[in-house]
């Protein structure tokens, strides 16, 4: 017994520096393992940053496109004001037609006024052609704007679908990282339990075989201590990784919460854009109706020109026939025929003015309906 005790006492003094050497020798592979864990973490963080930057860039582009849509809507408003200017031109044309009645009344004094009347009719024809050309340009612009609005709405819908897909991907990544962390923690706990059980077994075996294999037990204890130190370091590294993964999970949740109000804003702007598209379509339909009405007015103007030419030819024939008749009879007949012509012109002007008022009232009612909508 005394010999066994004397052997045990000097043993630890000699073998004390050996675990330090072994622990120093095992630091390098553990450090290498930590570098290996850092590479996928940095890659995942870079991927998340790249995706967040891409999403921010998409949102910025969509805001720029929405600003362009607003500018195009303002252009539509300016074009509607130009259309009101065309309506004022039509009212001026009606005023000119009323002035033609006065010129017909003054036709008894001299035939030179007839040439002026023909010039005014030609000017009216030119103004009508200009109005038709401007209306064609407006219809083309409205068609182009309708196509642009439809393209923009399609782009908004696509971006919303992409945003929802990206949020789902972020959620799945966060869940996967959380599950990986929990698995690593559980595995580390199981390893610690196994090590504690091994320590108990080793202690029991040392108590049983302390007399026979003291040196072997000391070596086993040194190995176990080295393993414990390495395992504790591994556990500390796993805890650090758990902290980093939890911080990353929090960052991902914050990013998701920051993207959700942007998605809701996009969804809130969609109905306004759709209402604008519907209003533009209605305005285009109203313009088509006004074009038809303007075509009817041009037909009426051509008929009026034919009637005026017929009246001029009749007046010339009357002058030729009245050259051989007395002066008094010629004046009476001329007055009667001019009264008849005035009546015809007055009836035609009343009919044309009534048709124009009806078309303008219908257009105003349709515009009120679109504004109420």
UniProtKB/Swiss-Prot annotation:
Cysteines joined through disulfide linkages: none
Regions annotated as coiled coil: 64-257, 290-325
Further facts: Shares a common promoter with APAF1 from which the 2 genes are transcribed in opposite directions.
Start-end of Basic and acidic residues biased regions: 18-30
Transmembrane parts of this sequence: 43-59
GO cellular component: endoplasmic reticulum; endoplasmic reticulum membrane; nucleolus
Sorted UniProt keywords: Coiled coil, Endoplasmic reticulum, Glycoprotein, Membrane, Transmembrane, Transmembrane helix
Chain segments carrying region Disordered: 1-38
Broad class of where this protein is predominantly found: endoplasmic reticulum
Protein name: Inhibitor of nuclear factor kappa-B kinase-interacting protein
Compositional bias per record (Basic residues), positions renumbered to this chain: 1-11
InterPro entries membership: Inh_kappa-B_kinase-int
Protein encoded by which gene: Ikbip
Membrane topology field: Single-pass membrane protein
Glycosylated sites: 151
Compartments reported by the entry: Endoplasmic reticulum membrane
PTM comment: N-glycosylated at Asn-151.
Annotated organism of origin: Rattus norvegicus
Function: Target of p53/TP53 with pro-apoptotic function.
């Amino acid at each position: 017994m005394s010999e066994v005790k004397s052997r045990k006492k000097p043993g630890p003094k000699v073998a004390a520096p050996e675990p330090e050497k072994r622990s120093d020798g095992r630091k390098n592979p553990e450090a290498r393992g930590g570098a290996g864990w850092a590479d996928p973490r940095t890659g995942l963080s870079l991927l998340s940053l790249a995706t967040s930057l891409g999403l921010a860039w998409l949102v910025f582009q969509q805001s720029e496109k929405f600003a362009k849509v607003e500018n195009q809507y303002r252009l539509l408003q300016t074009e509607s004001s130009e259309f009101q200017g065309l309506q004022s031109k039509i009212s001026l044309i009606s005023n000119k037609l009323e002035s033609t009645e006065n010129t017909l009344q003054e036709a008894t004094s001299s035939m030179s006024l007839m040439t002026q009347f023909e010039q005014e009719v030609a000017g009216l024809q030119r103004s009508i052609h200009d109005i038709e050309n401007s209306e064609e340009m407006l219809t083309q612009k409205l068609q182009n704007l309708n196509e642009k609005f439809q393209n923009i709405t399609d782009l908004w819908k696509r971006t919303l679908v992409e945003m929802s897909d990206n949020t789902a991907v972020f959620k799945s990544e966060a869940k996967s990282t959380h599950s990986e962390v929990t698995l690593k923690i559980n595995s580390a706990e199981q390893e610690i339990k196994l090590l504690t059980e091994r320590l108990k077994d080793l202690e029991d075996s040392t108590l049983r075989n302390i007399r026979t294999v003291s040196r072997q037990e000391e070596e086993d204890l040194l190995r176990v201590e080295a393993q414990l130190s390495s395992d504790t370091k591994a556990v500390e590294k796993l805890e650090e990784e758990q902290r980093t993964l939890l911080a990353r999970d929090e960052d991902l949740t914050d990013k998701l919460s920051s993207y959700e109000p942007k998605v809701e804003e996009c969804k809130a702007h969609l109905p306004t854009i759709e209402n604008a598209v519907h209003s533009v379509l209605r305005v285009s339909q109203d313009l088509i109706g006004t074009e038809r009405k303007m075509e009817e007015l041009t037909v009426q103007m051509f008929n009026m020109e034919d009637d005026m030419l017929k009246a001029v030819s009749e007046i010339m024939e009357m002058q030729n026939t009245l050259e051989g008749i007395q002066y008094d009879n010629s004046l009476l007949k001329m007055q009667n025929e001019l009264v008849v012509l005035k009546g015809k012109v007055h009836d035609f002007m009343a009919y044309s003015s009534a048709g124009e008022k009806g078309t303008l009232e219908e257009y105003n009612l349709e515009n009120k309906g679109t504004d109420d909508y």
